[in-house]
């Protein structure tokens, strides 16, 4: 043995240099060399160890060491091995295979694996780790005081209560100084653009999922899609908005420190939170007061509410705040020792138009029995329009890659006569703009957060600002890069950061690019400033990527591609001083990826997977239990039980992917007429009886499920209204459950087949930019203005596309109520049950909207969202046999049965509802006319929505239906093509079938007249 090795034989063999012997190996004596050769012969079949993963890079054994004294074999893998998820079961499998290949003398040796200088066990996330966890990746779950705690919400100890999460969705609209224009950072493809496409996932699904599990979520971009904005401030307020100051027993005074002041336009270097002042009060047991912020709301709708306060040394952590909205009153407790001098999100609430202090205000109350300082600055309602103006600076820095490795210094390019350029606003809603501009509006310091390039390149500023914003939220010792202990920041303890992107790239056929995860573990000796190991970022990346791939494979595509986990110094991965993942979910350029990516169900599944990954990561890091929150309840029904008493019932939904996602309770929310919902009533039962207060008032209800992990999204919204003068009520059956992607073609043409089916968004689609126009798969990318296959128009940018809001019972019910009838409602699943009692109803109103058979999750051969399912047919047959009347409306009430070759449903529609399908795409104008035969019974004309409307979905392919059987006759035709649009039947019962959705008639007066005519026809007068 050579001196220094003692009893350890080091045998090195570098597979990727087969012609070059390692120096240590070449220095071995002949006996040692023979031993080395025998050992390598034993493990040479290791090329099969990474079968199935080699597409992620070269993976093999780099070297081997044998410790004879301790009877241990150490195997060193090539660096790319850590691109794959590491688990104990996989390592044990590798050891088993290798041990079986070793000759007898090594069979009893232990085997250890290493990669990049670490034991392979170090790459197992804490959640999956068996043994003593790495303390440098752990974090105590301290009893934090939340930033803004909603008093009405329960605590979720096995969820995300008291966790703070910072995230951002992709890029955003930005100012390109070189071209002197505002533009997207990516190309418009397949009807969307990456700059706002991930925003759909976060805004619709991920952010509310995290918040409903108890987390406080911080966004670097504006979250609210409301284009109106109202500011109430002590300096200046919008319109007739007002700040009412009540000193009480104390005195509100203007602080000598700077605060917010509204400005219509922000120019470089301007900070709105240093442009004004704020109010404060020294609170004692004797001194107390209130501040009431009363906005003048320009139009009714949903508005995000933001509040702000100043920085005070003796700030209180329990400041009461009350939001009065159209649904009632919601109370908060504010921790003013953090989050000062910026916008703090309270929630999104419904407000009626105008000034209404009782139903539209925010009140700050000084807490009782407290000593300290309460401060208050501006309150903001709504997201608004972008107000940051840009023009070229005196010089321009070229774009830099986000990846730090290999970067060279950029050369400044002088821009002559820059003062001749005019300042330009984006002209877009603020939510569409890049985070750089929102961060300026939110009071972040420019030089260390959002303008690291001296206003000379907004593109670089934007991606660099995202991580520095996270650091500024936290402050020392985790402050912005290079500031060390100098910057106090906002004192918010952020637990993780998450960057949501999609990638580019194409593949042939139906193969997908798939999901990539990026983290950074190497900078600063692999440690965050607070002493946490940067391997925590790998844990987070592994947990989220693994969950996404697993759930997508089970629900959508069994061979969804899991790409690598890259350990690279991308700005968004390395800058945040907290565990961070940069996600590249799929390729927005690849047709096969976007076929799934445009599906709202896919978006929900991905967002839920991300939430689950985060929840498990944080629970493991904090050493506590995790429970996944339930899915929304279904099988909802309202029933009149006695007088004004209404029974609300529902059923829990089992999550096939999550055994812990079981409800332990429910919240029932109520809305009165067209106001917002209240804060809900908690119950552990699956039904609740309430007594409504007023007749001829519409009461709407929705239910969410809860457990210790969080609260689900609510299920559908049903409604009831009672009329003292009405006999048997109308039963509204909500059969419109569908959400679906647009049709997709991949043959001679490739892309979104919007002419066939534009799909149904979940509530809303804010990511649509315009229709695709390039369907040639061979078209190359030349420039973002000429991106090839998938290229799309820009005419719909900023327009929110309405989808299925699961609340169309209200629209139908409003017309029924105004016609003088009582009504009650149930889901179609409840109506389809064999024991459903159909006798107490005068008529059934079947809502089918854009319901249409769509491939189901988990079983793509089966179709969900079918019209006239067997159970519905059976109960309709029973109902009409007793003389009951039926209204059925929907765009596919004939098409669905025909395209699914459902001869039973076709026959039922003809025999009992007395219509037969003639054509789909019967019209594209939205205009209807009454037939001569029906002119004495129905209104002469009306319109449905066949184009864009901000409040109702587009009906792109209504059905043409013809009368079937004696007693049936046409009542409406589509004006343009004269195709039959509606059919009525008069016999032992009466029915009306409409080939367009009733709720798609946008004019309330026309809807009311149509419903009144139908119900009068049912009366048989």
Question: What are these language model-derived features?
Answer:
Residues 617-660, 710-728:
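Pro/Thr/Ser/Gly-rich low-complexity, intrinsically disordered linker/stalk tracts
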């Amino acid at each position: 043995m050579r001196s220094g090795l003692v009893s350890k034989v080091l045998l090195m063999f570098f597979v990727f240099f087969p012609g070059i012997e390692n120096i240590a190996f070449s220095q071995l004596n002949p006996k040692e060399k023979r031993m080395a050769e025998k050992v390598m012969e034993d493990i040479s079949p290791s090329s099969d160890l990474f079968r199935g993963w080699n597409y992620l890079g070269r993976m093999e054994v780099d070297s081997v060491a044998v410790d004879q004294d301790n009877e241990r074999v150490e195997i060193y893998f090539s660096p790319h091995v850590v691109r794959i998820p590491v688990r104990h079961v996989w390592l044990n499998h590798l050891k088993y295979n290798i041990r079986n290949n070793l000759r007898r003398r090594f069979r009893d040796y232990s085997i250890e694996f290493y990669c990049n200088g670490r034991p392979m066990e170090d790459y197992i996330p804490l959640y999956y780790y068996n043994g003593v966890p790495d303390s440098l990746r752990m974090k105590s779950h301290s009893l934090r005081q939340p930033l803004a705690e909603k008093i009405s919400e329960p605590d979720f100890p096995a969820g995300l209560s008291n966790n703070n999460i910072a995230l951002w969705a992709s890029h955003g609209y930005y100012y390109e100084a070189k071209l002197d224009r505002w533009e997207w950072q990516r190309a418009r493809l397949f009807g969307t653009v990456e700059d706002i496409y991930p925003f759909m996932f976060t805004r619709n699904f991920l952010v509310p999922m995290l918040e409903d599990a108890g987390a406080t979520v911080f966004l670097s971009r504006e979250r609210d899609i409301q284009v109106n904005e109202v500011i109430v401030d002590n300096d200046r307020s919008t319109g007739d908005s007002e700040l009412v100051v009540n000193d009480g027993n104390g005195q509100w005074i203007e602080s000598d420190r700077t605060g917010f002041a509204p400005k219509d336009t922000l120019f470089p270097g301007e900070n709105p939170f240093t442009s004004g002042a704020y109010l404060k009060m020294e609170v004692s047991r004797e001194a107390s007061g209130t501040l009431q912020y009363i906005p003048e709301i320009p139009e009714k709708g949903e508005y995000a509410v933001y509040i702000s306060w100043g920085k005070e040394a003796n700030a209180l952590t329990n400041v009461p705040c009350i939001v009065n909205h159209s649904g009632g009153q919601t109370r908060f407790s504010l921790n003013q020792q953090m989050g000062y001098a910026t916008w703090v999100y309270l929630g999104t609430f419904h407000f009626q138009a105008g000034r209404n202090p009782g139903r539209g205000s925010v009140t700050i109350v000084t807490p009782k029995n407290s000593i300290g300082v309460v401060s208050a600055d501006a309150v903001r309602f709504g997201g608004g329009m972008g107000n940051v103006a840009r023009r070229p600076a005196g010089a321009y820095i070229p774009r830099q890659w986000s990846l730090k490795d290999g970067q060279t210094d950029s050369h400044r390019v002088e821009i002559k006569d820059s003062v001749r350029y005019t300042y330009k606003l984006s002209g877009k809603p603020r939510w569409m703009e890049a985070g750089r501009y929102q961060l300026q509006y939110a009071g972040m310091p420019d030089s260390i957060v959002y303008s690291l390039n001296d206003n000379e390149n907004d593109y670089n500023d934007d991606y660099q600002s995202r991580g520095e914003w996270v650091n500024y939220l936290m402050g020392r010792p985790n402050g912005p890069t290079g500031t060390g202990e100098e910057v106090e920041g906002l004192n918010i303890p952020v637990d993780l950061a998450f960057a949501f992107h999609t990638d580019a790239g194409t593949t042939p056929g139906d193969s997908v690019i798939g999901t990539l995860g990026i983290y950074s573990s190497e900078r600063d000796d692999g440690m965050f400033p607070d002493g946490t190991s940067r391997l925590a970022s790998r844990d987070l990346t592994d947990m989220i990527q693994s969950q996404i791939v697993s759930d997508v494979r089970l629900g959508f595509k069994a061979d969804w591609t899991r790409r690598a986990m890259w350990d690279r110094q991308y700005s968004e991965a390395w800058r945040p001083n907290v565990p961070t993942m940069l996600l590249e979910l799929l390729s927005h350029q690849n047709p096969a990826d976007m076929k799934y990516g445009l599906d709202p169900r896919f978006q929900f599944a991905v967002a839920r997977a991300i939430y689950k990954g985060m929840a498990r990561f944080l629970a493991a890091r904090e050493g506590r239990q995790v429970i996944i929150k339930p899915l929304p309840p279904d099988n909802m029904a309202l029933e009149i039980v006695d007088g004004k008493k209404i029974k609300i019932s529902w059923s829990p939904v089992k999550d096939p992917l999550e055994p812990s996602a079981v409800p332990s309770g429910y919240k029932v929310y109520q809305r009165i007429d067209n106001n917002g919902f209240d804060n809900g009533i908690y119950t552990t039962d699956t039904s609740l009886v309430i007594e409504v207060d007023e007749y001829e008032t519409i009461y709407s209800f929705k239910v969410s499920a809860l457990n210790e992990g969080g609260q689900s999204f609510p299920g559908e919204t049903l409604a009831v209204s009672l009329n003292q003068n009405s006999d048997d009520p109308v039963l509204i059956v909500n059969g419109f459950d569908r959400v679906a992607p647009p049709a997709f073609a991949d043959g001679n043409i490739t892309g979104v087949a919007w002419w066939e089916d534009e799909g149904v968004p979940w509530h809303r689609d804010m990511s649509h930019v315009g229709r695709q126009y390039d369907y040639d798969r061979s078209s190359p990318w030349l420039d973002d203005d000429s991106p090839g296959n998938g290229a799309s128009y820009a005419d719909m940018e900023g327009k929110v596309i309405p989808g299925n809001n699961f609340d169309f019972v209200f629209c139908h019910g409003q017309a029924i109520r105004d016609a003088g009838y009582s009504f009650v409602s149930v889901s179609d699943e409840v109506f389809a049950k064999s024991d459903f009692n159909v006798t107490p109803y005068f008529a059934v109103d079947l809502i089918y909207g854009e319901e249409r058979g769509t491939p189901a999750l988990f079983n793509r051969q089966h179709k969900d969202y079918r019209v006239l399912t067997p159970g519905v047919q059976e109960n309709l047959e029973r109902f009409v046999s007793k003389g009951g009347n039926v209204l059925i409306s929907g765009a596919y009430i004939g098409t669905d049965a025909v395209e699914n070759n459902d001869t039973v449903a076709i026959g039922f529609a003809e025999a009992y509802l007395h219509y037969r399908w003639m054509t789909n795409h019967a019209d594209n104008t939205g205009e209807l006319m009454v037939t001569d035969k029906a002119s004495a019974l129905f209104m002469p004309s009306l319109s449905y929505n066949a184009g864009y409307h901000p409040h109702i979905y587009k009906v792109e392919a209504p059905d043409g239906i013809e009368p079937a059987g004696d007693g049936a006759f046409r009542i409406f035709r589509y004006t343009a093509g004269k195709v039959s649009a509606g059919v009525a039947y008069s016999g032992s019962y009466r029915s009306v079938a409409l080939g367009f959705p009733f709720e798609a008639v946008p004019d309330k007066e026309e809807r009311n007249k149509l419903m009144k005519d139908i119900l009068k026809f049912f009366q048989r007068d």
